């Protein structure tokens, strides 16, 4: 479909939308068609029938539907016959609000032999046009209703005309017969065809109001700044919509782009640009509808019963052949990917590969591999790894099962004796598995790997060495076929134990499956599989224990005997019979699962000591597995609901913000709706923060990918270099807008250029829709034509969900300054679909001095050293800001108002030589504080400005600029003005000082050579100072290290600072720095590179109180004390571990001996016979008591560190500190109660007193707290604590 939409309420029924099919049909861009009359007189030519044109105009005037065949001309001059279908769209009250004109090509006319061509069509024929591209346009009915109500509320009441707002001009179409007025306008074309077209004069009224200045319909718009004139023959169009008989009053057409208005200013050759016409007279019948401005009327007009459904679609039904980017343009997106030829199987390999060293895509390389060498990321290796994984899983399941259940079964033995090894299916499968494992070893010897430098190693020798140092031993042990080696020897138990060596391969599999730990579902599945596998192993062990005790047990109390009695299959006296293998395995698996998940149900219970001990171990393992699985499940669920929790938290903040500031309900609803939509679109993630976490080179590639559609399909960006596109992509910002969101308000500064990527927007002036824009449209203002940002002449509102790319004017101009060869192409190709700049709000903007001289040539702006905070001067007519003067070039400082800034002597681009001369001339002139609005006299110098030479266009700061803030007190021999010059460098870490502090007598900008020489001097002074400080510090620290070698710890040579003043060690001052002081030296010491100090030197603290080094006398006094033991000595560490083992022994055997051994008859008889020495535990307890007493003596001579982190070695202070601390606990735990109360007969009292040794566990727990940061150590300590508490409770239970 090819159609246009015109607003019936706007002057001349201007076009507010045209789809891509119409643009392709006529050859004009959307920017050239917007705001033109819907009669399409710009398509008329010599063969256009005047009668057909008059019929279209009559249909528009009469607001009636009509189909007309008419000959139109394309932009290249070719003619075609078209069927135009005029469809008026009415609101619920029957008033026409818009027209839809549909165009269907009937046939093409051959215009080769035609001598006459329309003057409107002078462009050369283009070869990329494809006639008849079918594209549709879809706009929902609520948008049309909203358009109706907005337009209805913008018309003045009454029937008299008047001057309306410039952006909201409406046209009155008289629908009833009336007497012709002398002020009425007639159509020349209709009057010329009176014999053919009959109709009253009131049906031929114009769509414009009288009194408009005479003007001709302009030709096709030219947005290029290099165009110098409009088409002088454009006024000779064959069909004009409205023209007065005196040719003195002709309505103008307001176009989307204002380039024609600007070009009409030049040289006085053309009349002044047209303005909006006055509002025409209102008909009494329509005033009731148009006067509806209240909310109730607007709601009443939103009914849809009387309006037909009209669908408009922005989506193309088939691709544009001329929009397809060439090969050079398509290479901008991910250029590195095209250099590789990976097929689909390799992509699948990267997903399925189990190798831990698979390279990421951007590091893949094509190494030179030897023959029969396999790449570790090849498809074959991926498939082989999965096959080995399946074999390992088979081994983990069937190896314990066969070792426990099958080796000693009578039927299995009889079958093996009859037909040999081949009769066992599992044995054959095991043999195949062993062969596969051996083949895997051979493959691993020829498989590449990635070394520490991320290089693919393919040399066979290096691969073999790497494999020998890694997994070779485990793989070799797991691949030994023990069944064949020991087959027939009769030692089935040995075979079963040796076959379990295959389980070692599970370690390697666990390492490879660790990559899936980031997926919640995968972790849960692996945990459940691990739980089931451990239960299977424990079931095999449980059966092995019962089977081992079954032949030697006469009491028949084992779990197998109980199982046989329960199911009616008891064992006979010879040990035969009993339950089947299936019954045994299922019962064992049931017991292990019930013990792992709970305490069991009692129907299968342990009876023998071996079974009970194993049950204890099962319950201990079960508690750990139960906690780990449910802990991970809780974490997975929490992770799943983390987004919901964040949403509710952020929503609560929004509501608290609304409540605190008492925001009214309409604005509150907008806030909540926007928050909900933004959250659904981004899930609460700051995409910009995520992007900034990557390096700049990767950011550029990502931005290039995000903006690939815009850069490929937008005409101005075609032909740009990759570097230019990367720079532009970094500057673009993506904006998402929901329906009804206002992107730009009327009167806002136009600081950016917008490119629509998806969706549709409407532009309103007041409540009148003046344009509807869609995909690939551009709106904003032509930045190259204006030195200052203008103000918007309307509101920009989203009709659907929209994605827009915007770039700020400063960013765009900065990139174009860096790529001047692309700048000319960009400005000449840029076609802004709708120009939002309001020229009426800026007096004299189109014909002002800002454009008059600057339009004749391309503007050159030097923005490389311009700060983002340096704004342009205020616009004329506004109150000037009485703030700091702007430093740099601006429109207000280039000349007087009324003088073209381009004609200023300093306006043109200057060479580096002229820049230097100019800088030298300015260096002696004073800097003046000039307000923004005050003009500068022509002869007055511009003062201190930022560097704008062509050679200084880099966007980076000077390497020394970061240090200026730290050494500003030292290098004060430069003037303040020079320091401020370098504070003007962009994006420097040092904040720019306020310009109000600049003295009026400050010198201007220094020449560039002088600046560079002073920078070199500053660099030399910094290097000299750093070298001297490093040498002095190294010397001092070497002297101190000679004394610190006597004391092991690093903090032993550090004492607290005294109350005296800081050290004032003399330092040689540097001659060019007269202001070098100790305070400034302390500042310099903050950035001295301590990495250059000698190795082993202690690191001096820079925060907090300064510590002074201990004196040699203190060190000597420290070493003069005899028999001191320091806490960091190796002997002290060994002694502490020995005491720890003794404490653990005490914690285990003291409750056991107190509960089980003291009142046993055999123990009492043995003690009565040979005395105390006959009890082994008693002897060990005596040795433990002696060791604890020795530990008390050692603690009296062990140094400690006080609260000031000083090493205390005085014996008296050590004794006082020990008496206040652990002495009482250590003394009670070291008392030998066995010897003191031996022979008294009070065994219960001895047992209770011996438990006092457990007090040492408190001290041990304090020392073991340092291992709390290691997860495995904490888990091991928790398990040991659990077992120890169970042991104590068992002793108490006894």
From Swiss-Prot:
Residues 1008-1035 form a coiled coil. GO terms for molecular function: delayed rectifier potassium channel activity; inward rectifier potassium channel activity; protein homodimerization activity; scaffold protein binding; transcription cis-regulatory region binding; ubiquitin protein ligase binding; voltage-gated potassium channel activity; voltage-gated potassium channel activity involved in ventricular cardiac muscle cell action potential repolarization. It catalyses: K(+)(in) = K(+)(out). Keywords: Cell membrane, Coiled coil, Ion channel, Ion transport, Membrane, Methylation, Phosphoprotein, Potassium, Potassium channel, Potassium transport, Transmembrane, Transmembrane helix, Transport, Voltage-gated channel. Residues 211-223 have a biased composition (Pro residues). It is a multi-pass membrane protein. Residues 207-258, 844-956 are annotated as: Disordered. Residues 15-44 form the PAS domain. Residues 857-866 have a biased composition (Basic residues). It comes from the Eukaryota. The modification Phosphoserine is found at residues 212, 216, 257-258, 294, 325, 845, 848, 1110. The modification Omega-N-methylarginine is found at residue 987. A motif (Selectivity filter) lies at residues 598-603. Pore-forming (alpha) subunit of voltage-gated inwardly rectifying potassium channel. Characterized by unusual gating kinetics by producing relatively small outward currents during membrane depolarization and large inward currents during subsequent repolarization which reflect a rapid inactivation during depolarization and quick recovery from inactivation but slow deactivation (closing) during repolarization. Channel properties are modulated by cAMP and subunit assembly. This is Voltage-gated inwardly rectifying potassium channel KCNH2. The gene is KCNH2.
């Amino acid at each position: 479909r090819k159609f246009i939409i015109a607003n019936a309420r706007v002057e001349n029924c201007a076009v507010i939308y045209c789809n891509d099919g119409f643009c392709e049909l006529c050859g004009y861009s959307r920017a050239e068609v917007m705001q033109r009359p819907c009669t399409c007189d710009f398509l008329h030519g010599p063969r256009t029938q005047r009668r057909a044109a008059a019929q279209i105009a009559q249909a528009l005037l009469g607001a009636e539907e009509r189909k007309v065949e008419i000959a139109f001309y394309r932009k290249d001059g070719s003619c075609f016959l078209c069927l135009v279908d005029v469809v008026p769209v009415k609101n619920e009250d029957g008033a026409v609000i818009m027209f839809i004109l549909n165009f269907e090509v009937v046939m093409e006319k051959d215009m080769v032999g035609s001598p006459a061509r329309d003057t409107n069509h002078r462009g050369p024929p283009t070869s990329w046009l494809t006639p008849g591209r079918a594209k549709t346009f879809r706009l929902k009915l609520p948008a049309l209703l909203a358009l109706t109500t907005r337009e209805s509320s913008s018309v003045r009441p009454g029937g008299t005309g008047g001057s309306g707002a410039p952006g909201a001009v409406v046209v009155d179409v008289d629908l009833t017969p009336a007497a012709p007025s002398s002020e009425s306008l007639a159509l020349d074309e209709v009057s010329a065809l009176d014999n053919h077209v009959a109709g009253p004069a009131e049906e031929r009224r114009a769509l414009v109001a009288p009194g408009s200045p005479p003007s001709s319909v302009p030709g096709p718009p030219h947005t290029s700044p290099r165009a110098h004139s409009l088409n002088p023959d454009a006024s000779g169009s064959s069909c004009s919509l409205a023209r007065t008989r005196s040719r003195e009053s002709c309505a103008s057409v307001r176009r989307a782009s204002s380039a024609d208005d600007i070009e009409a200013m030049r040289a006085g050759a053309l009349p002044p640009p047209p303005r909006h016409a006055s509002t025409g007279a209102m008909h009494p019948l329509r005033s009731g509808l148009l006067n509806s401005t209240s909310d109730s009327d607007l709601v009443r007009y939103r009914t849809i019963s009387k309006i037909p459904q009209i669908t408009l679609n922005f989506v193309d039904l088939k691709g544009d052949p001329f929009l397809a980017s060439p090969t050079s343009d398509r290479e901008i997106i991910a250029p590195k990917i095209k250099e590789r030829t990976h097929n689909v199987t390799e992509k699948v390999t990267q997903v399925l590969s189990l190798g831990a060293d698979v390279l990421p895509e951007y590091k893949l390389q094509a190494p030179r591999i030897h023959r029969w060498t396999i790449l570790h990321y090849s498809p074959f290796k991926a498939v082989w790894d999965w096959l080995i994984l399946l074999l390992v899983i088979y081994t983990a399941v069937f190896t314990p099962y066969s070792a426990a259940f099958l080796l000693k079964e009578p039927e299995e033995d009889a079958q093996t004796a009859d037909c040999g090894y081949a009769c066992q299916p599992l044995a054959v499968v095991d043999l195949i598995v062993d062969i596969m494992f051996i083949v895997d070893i051979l493959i691993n010897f020829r498989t590449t790997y990635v070394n520490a430098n991320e290089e693919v190693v393919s040399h066979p020798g290096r691969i073999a060495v790497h494999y020998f140092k890694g997994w070779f031993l485990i793989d070799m042990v797991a691949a030994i076929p023990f069944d064949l080696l020991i087959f027939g020897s009769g030692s089935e138990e040995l075979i079963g134990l040796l076959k379990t060596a295959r389980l070692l391969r599970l370690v390697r599999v666990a390492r490879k499956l660790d990559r899936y730990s980031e997926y919640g579902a995968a972790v849960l599945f692996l945990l459940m599989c691990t739980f089931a596998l451990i239960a299977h192993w424990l079931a095999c062990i449980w059966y092995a224990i019962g089977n081992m005790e079954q032949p030697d047990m006469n009491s028949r109390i084992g779990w197998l005997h109980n199982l046989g009695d329960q199911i009616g299959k008891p064992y006979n006296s010879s040990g035969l019979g009993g339950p089947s293998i299936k019954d045994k395995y299922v019962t064992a698996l049931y017991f292990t699962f019930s013990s792992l998940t709970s305490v069991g149900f009692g129907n299968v219970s342990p009876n023998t000591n071996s079974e009970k001990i194993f049950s204890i171990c099962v319950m201990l393992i079960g508690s750990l597995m139960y906690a780990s699985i449910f802990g991970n499940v809780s974490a997975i669920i929490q992770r799943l609901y983390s987004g919901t929790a964040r949403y509710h938290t952020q929503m609560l903040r929004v509501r608290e913000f609304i409540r605190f500031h008492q925001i009214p309900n309409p604005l509150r609803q907008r806030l909540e709706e926007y928050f909900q939509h933004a959250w659904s679109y981004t899930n609460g993630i700051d995409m910009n923060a995520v992007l900034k976490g990557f390096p700049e080179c990767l950011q550029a590639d990502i931005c290039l990918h995000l903006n690939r559609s815009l850069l490929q399909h937008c005409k101005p960006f075609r032909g740009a270099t990759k570097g230019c596109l990367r720079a532009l992509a970094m500057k673009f910002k993506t904006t998402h807008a929901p329906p009804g969101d206002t992107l730009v308000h009327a009167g806002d500064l136009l600081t950016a250029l917008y490119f629509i990527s998806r969706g549709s927007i409407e532009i309103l002036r007041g409540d009148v829709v003046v344009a509807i824009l869609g995909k690939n449209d551009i709106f904003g203002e032509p930045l190259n034509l204006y030195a200052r940002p203008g103000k918007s002449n309307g509101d920009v509102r989203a009709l659907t969900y929209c994605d827009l790319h915007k770039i700020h004017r400063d960013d765009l101009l900065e990139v174009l300054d860096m790529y001047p060869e692309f700048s000319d192409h960009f400005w000449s190709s840029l076609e802004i679909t709708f120009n939002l700049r309001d020229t009426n709000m800026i007096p004299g903007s189109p014909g002002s001095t800002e454009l008059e001289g600057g339009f004749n040539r391309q503007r050159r702006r030097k923005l490389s050293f311009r700060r983002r905070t340096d704004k342009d001067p205020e616009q004329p007519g506004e109150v000037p800001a009485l703030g700091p003067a702007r430093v740099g070039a601006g429109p207000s400082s280039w000349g007087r108002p009324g003088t073209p800034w381009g004609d200023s002597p300093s306006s043109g681009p200057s060479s580096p030589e002229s820049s230097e001369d100019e800088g030298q001339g300015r260096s002696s002139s004073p800097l003046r504080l000039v307000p923004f609005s005050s003009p500068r006299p022509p002869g007055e110098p511009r003062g201190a400005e930022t560097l704008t030479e062509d050679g200084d266009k880099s966007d980076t700061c000077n390497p020394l600029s970061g240090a200026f803030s730290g050494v500003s007190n030292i290098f004060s021999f430069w003037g303040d003005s020079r320091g401020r010059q370098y504070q003007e460098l962009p994006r420097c870490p040092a904040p720019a000082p306020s310009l109000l502090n600049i003295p009026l007598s400050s010198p201007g900008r220094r020449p560039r050579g002088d600046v560079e020489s002073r920078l070199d001097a500053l660099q030399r002074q910094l290097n000299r100072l750093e070298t001297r400080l490093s040498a002095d510090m190294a010397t001092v620290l070497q002297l101190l290290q000679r004394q610190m070698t006597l004391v092991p710890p690093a903090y032993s040579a550090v004492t607290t600072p005294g109350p005296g003043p800081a050290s004032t060690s003399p330092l040689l001052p540097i001659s060019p720095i007269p202001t070098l002081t100790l305070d400034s030296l302390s500042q310099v010491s903050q950035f001295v590179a301590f990495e250059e100090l000698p190795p082993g030197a202690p690191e001096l603290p820079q925060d907090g109180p300064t510590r002074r080094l201990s004196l040699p006398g203190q060190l000597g006094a420290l070493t003069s004390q005899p028999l001191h033991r320091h806490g960091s000595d190796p002997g002290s560490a060994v002694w502490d571990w020995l005491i720890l083992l003794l404490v653990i022994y005490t914690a285990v055997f003291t409750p056991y001996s107190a509960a089980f051994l003291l009142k046993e008859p055999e123990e009492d008889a043995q003690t009565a016979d040979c005395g105390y020495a006959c009890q082994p535990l008693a002897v060990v307890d005596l040795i433990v008591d002696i060791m604890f007493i020795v530990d008390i003596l050692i603690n009296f001579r062990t140094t400690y560190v006080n609260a000031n982190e000083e090493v205390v070695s005085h014996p008296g202070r050590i004794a006082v500190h020990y008496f206040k601390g652990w002495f009482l606990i250590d003394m009670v735990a070291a008392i030998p109660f066995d010897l003191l109360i031996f022979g008294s007969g009070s065994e219960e009292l001895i047992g209770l007193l011996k438990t006092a040794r457990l007090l040492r566990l408190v001290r041990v727990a304090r020392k073991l707290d340092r291992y709390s940061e290691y997860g495995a150590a904490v888990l091991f300590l928790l398990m040991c604590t659990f077992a120890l508490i169970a042991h104590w409770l068992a002793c108490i239970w006894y």
